[in-house]
């Protein structure tokens, strides 16, 4: 129960630095919501208007000098646009000017076009301005272009009363290219299929472990909690996607044009009452983050439980089960609640599904800590497995066979410990691009979505005791079905030694055992001291006849395959480690080896 006492202190330690450093509304390195983008555009507009006032207050002689526009202008010769490849011809006035000359006169005035702040433009030249970095989805390595004619006016679009501007280099990331669409469609298909398969297999696994009473023990209870966390994670992802993208597809939500950017920039900041429309979306995102965190922490619980069984001399499984339950479900609730409070107070914008600046570390730091701690436990357990393998197989098998056994045990433990999270843990997907980004996203989508399926296969469907219980249940069901079929036929055969009696069902008295029809195959042919050996009777020191009529299900112990896939009998004892019976301790190693 020590984990329950540590949880409040750990949450306070995590939230205090975040509360003291939550000074920014948005983080420029993260994906931004529409409201956050509006905030940045309005801030850029205010800065631009301030600069415009300073420029317009200059004397006209200074504005008409060469220094007013040399920094942002290019030559007046015809220019080929980089993005479209089109050639923009010179005006008639431009053609009259000698090559390499510079026009003097009234420049094009600086202005804000609701996207970026244009500087002074030299007459007859093309003005190039870097794409603004405050628009997240822009290509920040490109440029936007305008043309200032010889009369000192920004060139207009032919046939339209609006200024011509070329943003093609900036918005190339916003266009729906076929290759990018295929990548996102493939990623969506991978995680949808993966989580669906995991959800179905985990549901069956939980029902199996809950149905058979002989499978009820601390180890399987922890497995059931882990399975449930995987299931809730998958369900929360599907619910979140349905809520976020209801009414508009993902492609429509990501497709932006220059006109839409202008409309966003011209829109006033959303009022505080607009947040009420995001209530359902925010609830879905909050539950998704909570179940995501609980999944990581129940993976950590599995590692702590196995590590405790191996290294603790006295370990009460039943007593510590409650502590593990509080740790797995309660601790994530603490730091998720802290994140909700901070987000609602300091960054209550949008659906909470995207950027929230430094406040994201309230959730990410505990999750990253659980991944690192679980990886350390995994390395230590594999080390003990290797030592145990060398000791038990010294002189009995070659080195290659030992390595194969160690590799098998390591692969069995990897899905349980979530080792695949370590690969890209130090590389956020927002910091990479190109081929590396595609490799990372395909890797994470594949293993994260199918992890629940792998865990269900290894720790339930391949479990020897689970298979034995299913086979016994199937045998009982088929025997009962066969008996009902014979009972409906109207007659049954009963055999007592050499005599066979054919009677009607209506004349049958009390039946033996379960009332199943007996045949000569079920009776022994040998006698003991002149008396027939009846079913269920065994002389002391001789094996009893194993039949369904004489052996209760609770007494028919199947073969124990060990700790991870073995029998629950004896695993809930108070003693463990060196105090545990040698036979049981040996069984616990058999599965992973």
Curated annotation (Swiss-Prot):
The chain crosses the membrane at residues 187-211, 220-241, 283-307, 321-342, 358-382, 407-426, 435-462. Residues 1-26 form the signal peptide. A motif (Important for interaction with G proteins) lies at residues 474-477. PROSITE patterns: G_PROTEIN_RECEP_F2_1 (PS00649), G_PROTEIN_RECEP_F2_2 (PS00650), G_PROTEIN_RECEP_F2_3 (PS50227), G_PROTEIN_RECEP_F2_4 (PS50261). One of its GO terms (molecular function) is G protein-coupled peptide receptor activity. The modification Phosphothreonine is found at residue 551. Expressed in most tissues. Most abundant in kidney, bone and liver. One of its GO terms (cellular component) is receptor complex. SMART domains: HormR (SM00008). SUPFAM superfamilies: Family A G protein-coupled receptor-like, Hormone receptor domain. Disulfide bonds join 48-117, 108-148, 131-170. Keywords: Cell membrane, Disease variant, Disulfide bond, Dwarfism, G-protein coupled receptor, Glycoprotein, Membrane, Phosphoprotein, Receptor, Signal, Transducer, Transmembrane, Transmembrane helix. It comes from the Eukaryota. Residues 27-186, 242-282, 343-357, 427-434 are extracellular. Homodimer in the absence of bound ligand. Peptide hormone binding leads to dissociation of the homodimer. G-protein-coupled receptor for parathyroid hormone (PTH) and for parathyroid hormone-related peptide (PTHLH). Ligand binding causes a conformation change that triggers signaling via guanine nucleotide-binding proteins (G proteins) and modulates the activity of downstream effectors, such as adenylate cyclase (cAMP). PTH1R is coupled to G(s) G alpha proteins and mediates activation of adenylate cyclase activity. PTHLH dissociates from PTH1R more rapidly than PTH; as consequence, the cAMP response induced by PTHLH decays faster than the response induced by PTH. Belongs to the G-protein coupled receptor 2 family. It is linked to Metaphyseal chondrodysplasia, Jansen type: A rare autosomal dominant disorder characterized by a short-limbed dwarfism associated with hypercalcemia and normal or low serum concentrations of the two parathyroid hormones. This is Parathyroid hormone/parathyroid hormone-related peptide receptor. The gene is PTH1R.
